[in-house]
């Protein structure tokens, strides 16, 4: 089994865009660990593909049943990666990719038998990140402020050396090349 790859970084840094490019170019090499969440789907998101959308009661039941490798609560919503989702990717012969937050990274690091590799996607600046979040048109001012506050904590954590690699996404093509270089350096 190849080592899982954990990708994290503040909301709005381009993680989803980079991963969509990777999956489009290498559809048979990587599998996405589909996270579960209690938040409302955004326009265009598909249940079971982008996230597994569940109720708060369902999520809490999953916590009690130890179904998560990691889970966290952010902006009033729960997010988590299930053991079943990671196993499903591994059984398919693909490298598992987990897109998780800082709390999730800490949880996965506490499970050494996963032998995961950690990649952080950073914005060029907090100001640039704010522009990206505002440009989505899906965030309230309060939500943007919460995300920026969380981003500052995540950026500080990334500076501790908690990740194997940090990529600053100031140019999508350059960031994508760095992503591929990291992923294919050791499978």
Swiss-Prot record:
GO terms for biological process: GDP biosynthetic process; purine nucleotide metabolic process. The modification Phosphoserine is found at residue 149. CDD domains: GMPK (cd00071). Keywords: Acetylation, ATP-binding, Kinase, Nucleotide-binding, Phosphoprotein, Transferase. ATP binds at residues 9-16. It catalyses: GMP + ATP = GDP + ADP. Its EC number is 2.7.4.8. The keyword Metal-binding does not apply. The modification N-acetylserine is found at residue 2. The keyword Nucleus does not apply. Residues 2-184 form the Guanylate kinase-like domain. Pfam families: Guanylate_kin. The modification Phosphotyrosine is found at residue 157. One of its GO terms (cellular component) is cytosol. GO terms for molecular function: ATP binding; guanylate kinase activity. GMP binds at residues 35, 39-42, 51, 70, 79-81, 101. NCBIfam families: guanyl_kin. Present with 20500 molecules/cell in log phase SD medium. Belongs to the guanylate kinase family. HAMAP family: Guanylate_kinase. Monomer. PANTHER family: GUANYLATE KINASE, GUANYLATE KINASE-RELATED. Catalyzes the reversible transfer of the terminal phosphoryl group of ATP to the acceptor molecule GMP. Essential for recycling GMP and indirectly, cGMP. This is Guanylate kinase.
